[in-house]
């Protein structure tokens, strides 16, 4: 299998997603938001407002550790991020994709083939696996 390097917008066209192939090395261009269990629960189970215009601002959700620090002026600083296992989000994904328009989910560990067939394929979405711990530092 030959590996391709692909640039993908975080507000991708369906054609760009459909053009991806297994094994592609994908670089994301644009804004990506983090959300894990707490955000999913508040947004979906408690109907909390999402403070972004999704998917206009971004259709890329990174499953990772809480990563932002709120500054006194209300801005945010991003520290280091650590991917978290995406299989834990499966029960929320259909509703999450519908509510947010998410087309790109980034995380670690992948999902089951059933999840891909039930959630990603019907929504024209893609799952991207991150590199392992410490690999980012190794690669520079």
Regions found by a protein language model. Name each.
Residues 34-140:
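Feature captures the catalytic cores and cofactor-binding loops of soluble hydro-lyases/lyases
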Residues 10, 30, 64-66:
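Pocket-edge structural micro-motifs
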Residues 2-12:
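Short, structured beta-strand/loop micro-motifs enriched in basic residues and often containing a Trp
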Residues 14-19, 51:
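Short, surface-exposed secondary-structure edge patches
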Residues 1, 21, 53-57:
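A generic structural signal for short, non-catalytic loop/turn and secondary-structure boundary residues
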Residues 14, 25, 31-35:
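Short, charged beta-turn/beta-strand-edge "cap" motif at the junction between a beta-strand
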């Amino acid at each position: 299998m030959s590996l391709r390097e692909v640039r993908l917008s975080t507000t991708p066209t369906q054609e760009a997603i459909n053009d991806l192939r297994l094994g592609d090395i994908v670089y994301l261009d644009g804004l990506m938001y983090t959300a894990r269990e707490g955000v999913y629960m508040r947004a979906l189970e408690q109907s909390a407002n999402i403070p972004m215009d999704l998917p206009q601002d971004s259709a890329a959700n990174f499953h990772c550790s809480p990563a932002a620090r709120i500054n006194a002026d209300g801005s945010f600083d991003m520290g280091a991020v650590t991917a978290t296992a995406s299989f834990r989000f499966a029960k929320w994904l259909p509703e999450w994709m519908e509510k947010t328009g998410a087309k790109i989910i980034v995380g670690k560990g992948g999902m089951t083939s059933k999840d891909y067939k039930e959630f990603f394929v019907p929504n024209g979405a893609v799952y991207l696996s991150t590199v392992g711990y410490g690999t980012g530092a190794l690669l520079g």
